[in-house]
C-alpha cells in the first residue's frame, strides 16, 4: 500500500506540493488528473525514489522510496513522459535491462510489442516517437512489478495505438499490481482507470472509485440545461451535466466532465466525498 501524509516538496522557493495526504490500495489502476503545473510528475518521481520529500512522509509497503533499497527498486517501475532512444534493437535493450527486475518476462515483452504492431528487432534510435513510446510501455508492463508509475503514457500515440495501450494494460497487468497513470487526456484512459485522483498543488481534491463517484454525482445527458448543475457543457444533441445525485439514480461517469466540475467546486466536492 502507498501511504502519503502531509507531503511537501519545493524547487528552491517554488512550492510544488504542500500538505498532500492520501492512500492508494493494492491491485488498482489509478488515474492521476490535475491542471498543468500542480505536481503530477513531481509526485511520480517522489514515489519512484528519484527525489526526496521536503516535508511529511511517503511510504510504499513500509519502505521510504528515496532510500532506494534493491528490494524496493525491484518492485517498482517508473515510465517518464520523455523517453530516450538507445542505439540498440528493442529486443536487446529489453533482454539486457530486464535483468534488474526479478519478474521481468522477455516473452511478455515480445507479446506486448506484437499487440502494438511494433518490431522488436528494430533499432530504437530509428523508431518514430510513437514506436519508441510503445516500446517502453511494453518494457514497463513486462517488468511485472508490484507498482508501476506512468507519466502521460498516451502522449505521442495515435488513435489505434491508444486502443492498443488500453488492451495491453488490461491484459498484461496482474490483479496484484498497482498502477498510477498521470494523464491530461482522460478520455484515452476512461475504460481502464478506477479509482480517480484529482490533484491540486496544495490538496487532493478527489480520491474515489467510479462507484463512489456515481453514488455522489449524476452525469446527465439532456437537451435541457439544469440550473442546479455543478458543471455543464454543450455537446452534439444537448448537454452533458454533472449534478448532485440526490435520488440514487445510476449514470456513467464522464471523467472529463467530472474533472471540470471538481475544479469549479473544489471545496464543495471535497466535502461531499469526505462525509
Q: In which residue ranges do the predicted regions lie?
A:
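The feature captures the beta-strand-to-loop junction immediately N-terminal to the Walker
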Residues: 33-35
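Conserved ABC transporter NBD signature motif
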Residues: 56-67, 71-72
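Conserved structural motif at the start of ABC-family nucleotide-binding domains
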Residues: 2, 17-19
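ABC-family P-loop ATPase nucleotide-binding domains
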Residues: 71, 78-135
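Helix-to-loop junction immediately C-terminal to a conserved catalytic motif
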Residues: 48
